[in-house]
From Swiss-Prot:
Superkingdom in the source lineage: Bacteria
Localization (cell): Cell inner membrane
Role, per record: Part of the ABC transporter complex LolCDE involved in the translocation of mature outer membrane-directed lipoproteins, from the inner membrane to the periplasmic chaperone, LolA. Responsible for the formation of the LolA-lipoprotein complex in an ATP-dependent manner.
A GO biological-process term: protein localization to outer membrane
Organism in which the protein naturally occurs: Nitrosococcus oceani (strain ATCC 19707 / BCRC 17464 / JCM 30415 / NCIMB 11848 / C-107)
Enzyme Commission number(s) from the entry: 7.6.2.-
Protein name, entry field: Lipoprotein-releasing system ATP-binding protein LolD
UniProt binding sites for ATP: 46-53
Membrane topology type: Peripheral membrane protein
PANTHER family in UniProt: IMPORT ATP-BINDING PROTEIN (PTHR24220), LIPOPROTEIN-RELEASING SYSTEM ATP-BINDING PROTEIN LOLD (PTHR24220:SF689)
Family affiliation: Belongs to the ABC transporter superfamily. Lipoprotein translocase (TC 3.A.1.125) family.
The gene coding this protein: lolD
């Protein structure tokens, strides 16, 4: 790892992922190289089935590459056991998905505080931090509402707060506005960009929305298993 790579929040080199089913082998990703700097906001676009979600899973340590390296906050994932990888994810990364994945039996406050509780924070400190973030995303009147009592946009705002509650170095977002109408999609995306600037948390966002992607610092296209940087249409 060189000095430039040491400064990166997250980077990968020569990343590949192959899936095998019997005699059939499909190489979804090949020779993927990517580096994410502190405070940077990067969008990844590409056709359905191009491997965008697979790439995020590898970058987040949720899957293991067929070859190549992934480094998060200066640590090589290949050298960590499952417990260590889980701790690193909890400390250094936040995740936002197309489906909010909030626990239905928990309130917005409890869902948002959960990553801090898993990390060992006291209930009082976890809830204090969760309240502050929920207020920032506009949910100060929804602390005690469960996901079923929230609108789609409110659920995704709670998911954004949950992803940021541990002060991660980087947030990985997989189609975070994919289930929202245009108005809510633009509001949630703007919220994410605002928090990127305010908190200094790097963002890697997979999206099909070219209009939203164009608002980020850098747009990469996943094509034929490789990441390329091309002008937007």
């Amino acid at each position: 790892m060189n000095n430039t790579e040491q400064e990166m929040v997250l980077w990968c080199r020569d990343l590949a992922r192959k899936f095998t089913d019997g005699y059939l082998s499909v190489e979804v990703l090949r020779e993927v190289n990517l580096s994410i700097a502190p405070r940077e906001c990067v969008a990844i676009i590409g056709a359905s089935g191009s491997g965008k979600s697979t790439l995020l899973h590898l970058l987040g340590g949720l899957d293991r590459p067929t070859q190549g390296q992934v480094w998060i906050a200066g640590q090589n994932l290949a050298r960590l056991n499952d417990t260590e990888r889980g701790r690193l994810r909890n400390r250094a990364l936040g995740f936002i998905y197309q489906l909010h994945h909030l626990l239905p039996e928990f309130t917005a406050l409890e869902n948002t505080a959960l990553p801090l509780l898993i990390a060992g924070a006291s209930t009082a400190n976890a809830q204090k931090k969760a309240m502050a973030l929920l207020q920032r995303v506009g949910l100060e009147a929804r602390f005690n509402h469960k996901p079923g009592e929230l609108s789609g946009g409110e659920r995704q705002r709670a998911a954004v707060a949950r992803a940021l509650v541990t002060d991660p170095r980087c947030v990985l977002a997989d189609e975070p506005t994919g289930n929202l109408d245009r108005k809510n999609a633009e509001q949630v995306f703007k919220l994410m960009l605002d928090l990127n600037h305010e908190l200094g948390t790097a963002l890697v966002i997979v999206t099909h929305d070219i209009h939203l992607a164009a608002q980020t610092d850098r747009v990469l296209t996943l094509m034929d298993g490789r990441l390329v940087q091309e002008p937007l249409p």
